[in-house]
Amino acid sequence: HNLWHTPVITAKPFDDSFLDKLCEDVKYLLKPGAPGTLNQTNIWELPDLPETMVAVKDKMVELTDKYYRPLTEMPLPPLYGSKGYFREIKQNSIYRISPHKHAQTLGVGIIYIDVPKRNAGNLMMLDPRGGVLWHNQFTPFKRVAVERGLMVIHPGYITH
């Protein structure tokens, strides 16, 4: 999709059996205090990373390269997954992840692996190039409906 003439990639590249295996494979990373729950952990650097996780990273890099490389102003070196981590979003919790962006990252990749069937929510995105008017309720935004298996890749400058 080109939202605001900004390339946002949405795909569902994996089937349910792969997603089931992925969920099973990452359980050890998501236990309280496990490496996958810590922001300083780069999961791509962990030893013995499950093949399903490597496949997710490879697919994100493949799609980013396929759709973003033709849009760049200058030649790019080979792309790679620079940092990976998990986020668990708990509905109705006091703690919320604040709107943020990822500086100069070319592509930010997200995959939703465990999503409630009801009220899954939306990924909200603001493109700061159009001017984010924080005090104005009419600041333009886009929303992407979240569902299991959805992979979203967007430029790092998108506030989400």
List each model region and its residues.
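Non-heme Fe(II)/2-oxoglutarate
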Residues: 1-77, 85, 94-96, 122
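Catalytic core of non-heme Fe(II) oxygenases with the double-stranded beta-helix
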Residues: 80-158
